[in-house]
């Protein structure tokens, strides 16, 4: 990590609850690959059914669909979904290699890794 990049990239999974199997599988997929990138990545599970995750879920939904889309047309972020630095990357559980490629792409773009 070079001096200009002291912040880790943020990976967030929109997570409804433990009874949501796709949410569990998305969480497991991320937890399986992030140890490889641990010094560059921060992981957060946005549990939007809890008060602690509601605001972030709405914030990410507004970034996708705008205020009107969320509040007038009831459009929200897909569940489960995966965001990297606030950008939607996956709206379904990605294969391991695709998730690793996406993380590495963001790490390269942000100067954490060299482009090989």
Predicted regions and their residues:
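Local sequence-structure signature of Cys/Sec-based thiol-disulfide redox active-site neighborhoods
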Residues: 2-46
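Conserved strand-to-helix beginnings and helix N-cap segments that scaffold or border functional pockets
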Residues: 23-27, 57, 93-96
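Cysteine-centric redox/oxidoreductase cores and disulfide-bonded domains
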Residues: 29-36, 52, 73-76
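Glycine-rich, highly charged phosphate/nucleotide-binding loops
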Residues: 59-76
